[in-house]
């Protein structure tokens, strides 16, 4: 693992080392402040770096809001890195790609840091490295099948697009087209759901945008359901013009990207950091705080497919 922040690096090393010990995993954990030291001879490189945290994005927002753009990004509600932030991120990725060409030319870069789509495409076009971009946004389809009351193991979905702009182009239940079930829910149950406590709960950190009126409006407009962050980035501009409007379309707090929703998200990040620090300082069990569970992230399945031939699509031309 690599981090230029020494305190954060030591905290992460302590957490992972303790987790391995508690779970009896025979893994060797090494921590580096210099990425070149870590890249030497690597087979897989996972990038989850956010240069400056959310500072560059908030600076971009501040500049734009001063010129009259609500939330600083107008209708571009989910492209975290359209300007200042994108520059910092892609500049960093260039450095990683150059170092990989020199130090681990056969390694795979698993690119998780936003902007995933732009960053992955840029470095694979300009540098001779293998890279795949991954995001977990497609998992939001599970909110749909949960609300429809479907058995998950009998559902097949196809989610197509690029980062923060993906749509459910295929939706089948027990072998049959399931979109009519969604249409029926919209017709018969949507209004009651939008008034329910589980949708309107103002204390929830993450707003339930996936089945919001805004998401359904986009579905009616496009004919296919936007999934995950696409509900934020591909929904009609008229649902994002001001806070009151966002509340009508995305619930009591105005959805994930409103001034309230976004603050809740940033506060949750601080809470996680504080909790991790407390675990390290107190010596509390990591496994008790974060019980083992099967991940929905793609990093491990992807690496497993490359290393062990497990069936996953590893064609970078088709990867996100």
Task: Write out the residue ranges for each language-model feature.
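Conserved acidic E/D residue at the C-terminus of a beta-strand in Rossmann-like folds
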Residues: 1-6, 135
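Conserved N-terminal Rossmann-fold NAD(P) cofactor-binding segment
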Residues: 5-41, 48, 53-57, 61
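Short, surface-exposed alpha-helical segments at coil->helix boundaries
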Residues: 6-14, 90, 117, 138, ...
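A generic secondary-structure signal
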Residues: 15-19, 96-100, 147
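Proline-centered flexible-loop/turn and helix-kink motifs
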Residues: 21, 25, 105, 127-128
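Long, compositionally biased stretches enriched for glycine and/or charged residues
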Residues: 147-320
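Rossmann-fold NAD(P)-binding glycine/threonine-rich loop
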Residues: 10, 51-126
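Rossmann-fold dinucleotide-binding core
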Residues: 108-177
């Amino acid at each position: 693992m690599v981090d230029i922040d020494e305190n954060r690096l030591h905290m992460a090393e302590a957490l992972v080392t303790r987790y391995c010990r508690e779970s009896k995993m025979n893994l060797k954990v090494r921590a580096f402040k210099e990425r070149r030291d870590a890249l030497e001879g690597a087979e897989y490189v996972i990038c989850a770096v956010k240069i400056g945290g959310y500072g560059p994005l908030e600076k971009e927002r501040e500049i734009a809001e001063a010129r009259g753009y609500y939330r600083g990004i107008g209708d571009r509600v989910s492209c975290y890195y359209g300007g200042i932030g994108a520059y910092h991120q892609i500049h960093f990725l260039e450095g990683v790609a150059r170092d990989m060409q020199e130090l681990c030319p056969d390694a795979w870069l698993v690119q998780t840091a936003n902007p995933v789509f732009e960053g992955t495409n840029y470095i694979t076009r300009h540098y001779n490295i293998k890279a795949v971009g991954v995001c977990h946004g497609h998992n939001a389809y599970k909110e749909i099948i949960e609300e429809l009351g479907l058995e998950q193991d009998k559902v097949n979905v196809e989610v197509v697009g690029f980062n923060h702009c993906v749509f459910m182009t295929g939706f089948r239940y027990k072998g049959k087209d399931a979109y009519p079930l969604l249409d029926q829910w919209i017709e018969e149950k949507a209004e009651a759901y939008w008034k329910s406590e589980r949708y309107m709960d103002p204390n929830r950190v993450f707003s339930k945008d996936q089945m919001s009126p805004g998401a359904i409006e986009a579905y009616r407009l496009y004919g296919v359901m936007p999934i995950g962050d696409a509900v934020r980035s591909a929904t009609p501009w008229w649902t994002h013009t001001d806070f009151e409007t966002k509340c009508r379309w995305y619930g009591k707090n105005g959805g994930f990207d409103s001034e309230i929703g976004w603050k809740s998200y940033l506060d949750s990040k601080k809470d996680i950091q504080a909790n991790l620090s407390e675990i390290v300082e107190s010596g509390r069990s990591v496994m008790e705080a974060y019980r083992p569970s099967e991940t929905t992230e793609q990093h491990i399945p992807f690496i497993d497919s490359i290393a062990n031939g497990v069936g996953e699509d590893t064609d970078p031309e088709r990867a996100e």
